[in-house]
Amino acid sequence: MRAAIRQYSGNIPVTVVSVNAVSECAVCRRSGGGGLAESVPLRIVQGELHNGCFMEKIPFIGLYDLVMKLDALLDHLAFPQRDTALRSFGRDGIRRYCRMKEDLLPRLEQPWNERVMQDGWGRCATFSVHVCTRQNSSWQGSVRWLEAKEERKFRSVLELSYLLESALDLEPKDETSV
C-alpha cells in the first residue's frame, strides 16, 4: 500500500481515509400539529485519516467530521491554500473551528512514521484523497478507491462525499452463487 500511495502522490500531499465501520439508524421526527411521524435514515461512517506528513492517525465519526478534520489538516500544511476566508453567522462558528484545529495540532506536529501505515487498510474501504485546489469555498481533486483500484475526479466536497458513499453502498459479491 505504501508504494501505491507514494506512486500516486507526486508533489501533492495525499491523505488516506480508512473506513472501519458504517452504521445505519433512523431518526424520527413528528411533523407539526401532532401529525404523522417521519423516519429519516441516517448513515454514520467511522474511520481514520492518515497523511504522510504526520505520525498519528486521526479518527473521525461521520463525513462532516472527516471533512472538517481534513480541512484543518490542509490549513496546517498550507497546501493547497484556500482562496477564500472562512465565513460564519457569528464568531462562535469560527472559534469552534479554530479550537478543533488547535486540538489537532499536537497530533500534526509529529513527523511521519512508516509504522502508522502497517494496518492502514480500512475494514470497509480505503480511499486515497488528493486535494489539488481549494477554490470557490470547496475542494477539487481526485479520490482513489484502493481496494477496487478505481479513481474519480471531484469538483466539490459534496461530490467527494457522494463518491465515498457510493463506494460504501456496493454490496459484496456472493462467491457461492452461480
Regions of interest found by a model, annotated:
Residues 22-24, 30-33, 37-54, 132-148:
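Short aromatic-glycine-(Arg/Gly/Cys) micro-motifs in beta-strand/loop hairpins
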Residues 53-75, 140-178:
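Mixed-charge, glycine-accented linear interaction segment located at domain edges/termini
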Residues 1-32, 68-137, 167-178:
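Intrinsic disorder/low-complexity detector
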